[in-house]
From Swiss-Prot:
Name of the protein this chain belongs to: Uricase
PROSITE patterns: URICASE
Origin species: Drosophila virilis
GO molecular function: urate oxidase activity
Cellular localization per UniProt: Peroxisome
Source superkingdom: Eukaryota
Protein's gene: Uro
The UniProt record lists the keyword Oxidoreductase: yes
């Protein structure tokens, strides 16, 4: 990371007691290496109905020895190119059922294959492919089916056997950390990029009123955010990871939007965030802790008062989207007496 070394290597003592004494002044307190952004696509071709998983994988290893750093000895180093090949070979051997299960397969492989590896960290991001749906009636152009049908057919709406559509509503990711000396499997799943907006049923009033305040009470405002949510499992054996991810996403959306007809009041971003986290822990007993971040994406009312001759009356229809600066609200909710890596 430095453009030039602070001292030339030739000026340092390379051997002898003085060099050993200097080395003992310092210790490596954190380390690791790996391969990032390994892209892999797996197609399950069993039967006429195909399924796909496209992932971006990162594998990082921590070795017991420091000799690769301190001595330039690479005898324990599993090359990052070998780690890349491992991703493809294990995808071929085991398939990819979910990001979490594949990450566990990779992490267990590195620990069981290389005795000199102390810890493995696997990060996986899934590309949001969804099975395509089509209206099989003759009414082309008069209606459509949304691509979230849960059954093989729904009236005139039919799920395609082998065609998919990219639907980046939200991104699925996970982190798996396995340590040789710790029997606990750390599995963290997450959602990011879930952008939502509602035009009413949001307020923000009765906050601190002092000499720094200029914002008036907001009794009815636009509420928009880009949700990032992560959760850690205390039980990884009995959980259906794909179902759990969809459940968390549904909980977040429902607590934000409420009933389709009447909505749900949101007195603050904090309260909406808390309700979502609480329901995640209520519904998913395998989850020990959940963390959420909800930046407040502002939409400010355009002031039409100076233009009453052109557009008379009040304005509650035209707003100015403002990305920066923005508020950021976050919280972590845990079951009592449980620790996490979030």
């Amino acid at each position: 990371m430095f453009a030039t070394p602070l001292r030339q290597l030739s000026s340092l003592k390379r051997s002898g007691i003085a060099g050993q004494e200097q080395a003992q002044l310092y210790e490596i307190t954190n380390k690791g290496y790996g391969k990032d952004a390994v892209k892999v696509m797996h197609i399950n071709r069993k039967g006429p109905v195909h399924s796909i998983q496209e992932l971006e994988v990162g594998t990082h290893l921590k070795l017991y020895s420091n000799k690769d750093y301190m001595l330039g000895n690479n005898s324990d180093v599993v090359a990052t190119d070998s780690q890349k090949n491992t991703v493809y070979l294990l995808a071929k051997k085991h398939g990819i059922e979910s990001p979490e299960k594949f990450a566990l397969i990779l992490a267990k492989h590195f620990l069981s294959t290389y005795a000199h590896v102390e810890e493995v960290h696997v990060h996986v991001e899934a590309y949001p492919w969804q099975r395509m749906t089509q209206d099989v009636s003759d009414n082309i152009g008069k209606g459509y089916c949304e691509n979230n049908c849960n059954s093989r057919s729904n009236g005139n709406c039919q799920l395609h056997n082998h065609a998919f559509i990219f639907t980046p509503t939200a991104h699925d990711y996970c982190d798996v950390i396995l340590t040789r000396q710790d029997p606990k499997q750390t599995v963290i799943s997450g959602i990011k990029g879930l952008r939502v907006l509602k035009t009413t049923q949001s307020s923000f009033v009765n906050f601190v009123d002092d000499e720094f305040r200029t914002l008036a009470d907001q009794y009815d405002r636009i509420f928009s955010t880009v949700v990032e949510c992560s959760w850690e499992y205390s039980d990884t054996e009995s959980v259906n990871f794909l179902h759990a991810w969809e459940t968390v996403k549904d909980i977040v959306v429902r607590n934000f939007a409420g009933d389709p007809s009447v909505g749900i009041p949101s007195p603050s971003v904090q309260h909406t965030l808390y309700l979502s986290e609480k329901q995640v822990l209520d519904v998913l007993p395998q989850v020990s802790v959940v963390s959420m971040t909800m930046p407040n994406k502002h939409y400010f009312n355009f002031d039409t008062k100076p233009f009453q001759q052109l557009v008379p009356g009040e304005n509650n229809e035209v707003f100015i989207p403002t990305d920066k600066p923005h508020g950021t609200i976050y919280a972590q909710l845990s079951r009592k007496s449980l620790k996490s890596h979030l």
